[in-house]
């Protein structure tokens, strides 16, 4: 996915911001 910050914990980032599985990791960046 578009790894920008939360690439190490995709599951955490997806739940935190609620981003789709395709954009997992990019969520942590904002």
From Swiss-Prot:
GO annotations of cellular component type = chloroplast
State the UniProt keywords alphabetically.
ATP-binding, Chaperone, Chloroplast, Nucleotide-binding, Plastid, Repeat
Main subcellular localisation: plastid
GO molecular-function terms, A-Z: ATP binding
Which superkingdom heads the taxonomic lineage of this protein's source? Eukaryota
Miscellaneous note, as given in the UniProt record, is: On the 2D-gel the determined pI of this protein (spot n9) is: 5.9, its MW is: 92 kDa.
Concerning its family, UniProt says: Belongs to the ClpA/ClpB family.
Briefly state the protein's biological role: May interact with a ClpP-like protease involved in degradation of denatured proteins in the chloroplast.
| Name assigned to this protein | ATP-dependent Clp protease ATP-binding subunit ClpA homolog
